[in-house]
């Protein structure tokens, strides 16, 4: 796997961008077909913080052309229970993971060198990977290209999880197998084309040759793995660093939510067409979210971006032990509604990831009915609407106090929905 194929799109410090890339990747598994992933590109290049698509982190050191980062990144590997061929029948799915990593990069006239160390923190594989990469940026007019080569040293835990066969999964034609540690090599070519001052077309292709231990696995097909990328991104330009400003507000949100049926969406809640939650087995959550603004009044529009960290307690109503989860997400707020001069109202949409102490009960029950495994790592959407309590009551002291409702629509191995008030 290449290191951040589109991680250098923002050229101006303090800038932000938004886009998406479709990745088509030939599965390494026998009868695995082609996997398609829609990869959202949330881009932000702050003084200390950054977002590079599926990677978010902190700049520990930034000196001229040398940089050290601490980051988290989602690992897109494995196969799900509903997308397996005959060669994988009867095997437990191999799920995507979440890695914690540290990286070093150095830009020189002769190219860019990067090294990083990653460790799974989602307990999917418990694996570790070390990568080193070299790229040479080329530019001609609106076209920017970067050929790249990456070497990835993977430990036995990582390879055994994604490419091994456990003893309980062995059959007459699929013996138990553990590939052990190994070294993969990836070559790639990635590029962007400036359609305008702000819009960029993105494309890339890479090819990975697996270590011999992986290639000899009874579930891995012959040949290298090819990936193709195609997408677009919009560069909003540079903005004052709202996060670091002395006047930057801190958002504190206290919430309570109950699990709801799949058709109880935000629109129905607001219009009072869904005023109750699950009658049977409905679990609940209580939590606190802390947020800081990343961008205020984007492009002069009534649109703010706020980054949040949250600690949430899962109340499982006796079905299983209660637990905690940590959420990290970016949320956009639209404040341009026609009545906002009288009562400030915000429409919000958040996108993020959640790592739970144990898989939530709703996830466990839903997946058990389908005969599928659960996941502690969930991606989710967070739509909401809230209003200023001070504007409603005519109190200037409560002007910045908001009350609202929302839904947390999570998807790990399945979809689950919790609706909350805050």
Pin down the residues of each PLM region:
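Outer-membrane beta-barrel initiation region
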Residues: 2-61, 67-97, 237-239, 262
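Short loop/turn motifs that connect adjacent beta-strands in outer-membrane beta-barrel proteins
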Residues: 3-14, 48-65, 110, 139-145, ...
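Transmembrane beta-barrel domains of outer membrane proteins
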Residues: 9, 21-23, 43-45, 59-61, ...
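Transmembrane beta-strands of outer-membrane beta-barrel pores
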Residues: 22-28, 46-48, 72-78, 108-110, ...
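Outer-membrane beta-barrel "beta-signal"
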Residues: 39-43, 224-251, 422
């Amino acid at each position: 796997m290449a290191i951040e194929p589109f991680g250098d799109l923002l050229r101006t410090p303090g800038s932000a961008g938004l886009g998406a890339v479709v990745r088509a990747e030939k599965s390494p598994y026998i009868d695995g077909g082609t996997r398609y992933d829609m990869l959202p590109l949330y881009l932000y290049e702050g003084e200390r913080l950054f977002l590079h698509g599926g990677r978010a982190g902190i700049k520990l050191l930034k000196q001229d052309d040398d940089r050290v980062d601490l980051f988290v990144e989602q690992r897109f590997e494995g196969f799900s229970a509903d997308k397996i061929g005959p060669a994988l029948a009867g095997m437990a799915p191999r799920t995507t993971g979440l890695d914690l990593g540290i990286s070093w990069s150095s830009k020189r006239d002769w190219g860019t060198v990067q090294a990083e160390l990653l460790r799974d923190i989602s307990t999917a594989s418990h694996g570790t990977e070390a990568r080193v990469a070299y790229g040479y940026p080329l530019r001609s007019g609106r076209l920017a290209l970067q050929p790249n080569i990456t070497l990835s040293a993977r430990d036995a835990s990582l390879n055994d999880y994604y490419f091994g066969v456990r003893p309980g999964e062995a059959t007459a034609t699929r013996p138990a197998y553990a590939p052990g540690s190994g070294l993969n090599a990836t070559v790639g070519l990635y590029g962007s084309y400036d359609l305008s001052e702000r819009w960029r077309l993105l494309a890339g292709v890479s090819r990975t040759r697996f270590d011999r231990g992986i290639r000899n696995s009874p579930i891995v097909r012959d040949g290298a793995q090819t990936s193709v990328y195609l997408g677009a991104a919009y560069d909003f330009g540079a903005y004052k660093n709202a996060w670091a400003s002395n006047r930057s507000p801190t958002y504190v949100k206290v919430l309570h939510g109950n699990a709801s049926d799949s058709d109880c969406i935000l629109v129905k809640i607001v219009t009072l067409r869904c005023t109750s939650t699950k009658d049977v087995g409905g679990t609940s959550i209580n939590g606190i979210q802390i947020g800081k603004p990343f961008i205020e009044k984007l492009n002069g529009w009534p649109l703010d971006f706020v980054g949040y960290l949250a600690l949430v307690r899962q109340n499982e109503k006796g079905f299983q032990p209660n637990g905690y989860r940590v959420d990290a997400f970016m949320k956009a707020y639209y404040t341009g509604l026609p009545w906002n001069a009288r009562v400030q109202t915000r429409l919000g949409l958040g996108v993020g990831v959640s790592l739970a102490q144990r898989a939530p009960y709703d996830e466990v029950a839903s997946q058990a009915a389908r005969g599928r495994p659960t996941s502690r790592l969930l991606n989710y959407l967070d739509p909401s609407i809230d209003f200023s309590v001070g504007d409603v009551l005519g109190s200037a002291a409560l002007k910045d106090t908001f009350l609202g409702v929302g839904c947390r629509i999570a998807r790990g191995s399945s979809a689950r929905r919790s609706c909350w008030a805050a």
